[in-house]
Curated annotation (Swiss-Prot):
It comes from the Bacteria. One of its GO terms (cellular component) is small ribosomal subunit. Disulfide bonds: none annotated. The gene is rpsE. One of its GO terms (biological process) is translation. This is Small ribosomal subunit protein uS5. NCBIfam families: rpsE_bact. InterPro entries: Ribosomal_Su5_D2-typ_SF (IPR020568), Ribosomal_uS5 (IPR000851), Ribosomal_uS5_bac-type (IPR005712), Ribosomal_uS5_C (IPR005324), Ribosomal_uS5_N (IPR013810), Ribosomal_uS5_N_CS (IPR018192), Ribsml_uS5_D2-typ_fold_subgr (IPR014721).
Length: 169
């Protein structure tokens, strides 16, 4: 299923740093430190992207992560303020369960999952993160789950039915 690329310049994106990691390379003269930053960008209206930036300084790593995230933007189908159906995302040993929730529930999620969902514009959702607690795996499992979401219209088209037949309305 071919999708048109999303132009990051047309959207009002806000970025959010999920995790910063300091790594050390041991050299003859001691340790040389560098940083990696996991960054999430989103417009709060169904577009979100994640990126990993690496540099010798934290601000530069964050900037690179933001640029990478803007290149990885994708669309999240929303039904009002929640997701259309329950979905399970996998990455490595990380698993993230996303369930739609009623109005007023809020985003019941922690850490990396919350950052992605809020950036995407999801306001009411229940989540459960299982397996790996590594922010990289949790973040990528959340993204994998969001990419598996299908709108009611897409599901109807794939099954050769009308949207009203699927929703039971």
């Amino acid at each position: 299923m071919a999708t048109t690329p999303i132009n990051a310049n047309e959207l009002e994106l806000q970025d959010r740093v999920v995790h910063i990691n300091r790594v050390a390379k041991v050299v003859k003269g001691g340790r040389r430190f560098s940083f990696s930053a996991l960054v999430v960008v989103g417009d709060g209206a169904g577009h979100v992207g994640v990126g990993l930036g690496k540099a010798n300084e934290v601000p530069e790593a964050i900037r690179k992560g933001g640029d990478q995230a803007k290149k990885n933007l994708f669309r999240v189908p929303l039904v009002g303020t929640t997701i259309p159906h329950e979905v399970l995302g996998h990455f490595g040993s990380g698993r993230v369960l996303l369930k739609p929730a009623g109005e007023g529930t809020g985003v019941i999620a922690g850490g990396a999952v919350r950052a992605v969902l809020e950036a995407a514009g999801v306001r009411n959702v229940l989540t459960k993160s299982q397996g790996s607690r590594n922010p990289h795996n949790v973040l990528k499992a959340t993204v994998a789950g969001l990419k598996r979401l299908r709108s009611v219209e897409d599901s109807a088209r794939l099954r050769g039915k009308q949207a009203a037949e699927i929703t039971g309305a």
